[in-house]
Amino acid sequence: NQLNIQAPDLAGNTGPVAVVVKNAAGESAAYSATASKELPGLFTYSLAGKTYPAAVRLDAVVVGPPNVPGVVPAKPGEMILFFGTGFGPTNPAVTPGKVFSGAAPLVDSVTMRIGGVSVTPAFAGLSSSGLNQFNVTIPDLANGEHAVEMSINSVSIPSGVVIAVQR
């Protein structure tokens, strides 16, 4: 079972919180969860034992390893859009309970490295409800698979994500 929610702004409060689910059938018992300002993660997919970012080129073609139908490797100098969630507050803030549309930059800066090279996203923020987007130019890297590392306020995404690059 899975429940996807938009958590309300807890005004900086972090730590244990009680979650109660209410619907037409009634209400659940309280579940304990941990609130944090950010718990970042990229959306990913697994293929042949490797984890790739759910990323696209500007023409919406999915980025992935070579020789896989329907996907293409990233190229050095190319702008790639990465997607994730949990990267924290934006400015302007998102109104709780309202559907968001538009673009809102993150309040705090994201640190990102691809293949060990620091990159600065041209945009890092919310692009729709619950969806963070990062527009990043791929650095000058050799052909191959390169680690993707990201963090915000010293909280890192899970390790093991690689992006395929081919000149």
State what each model feature region is.
Residues N1-R167:
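A sequence-level detector for low-complexity, Ser/Thr- and acidic-rich stretches
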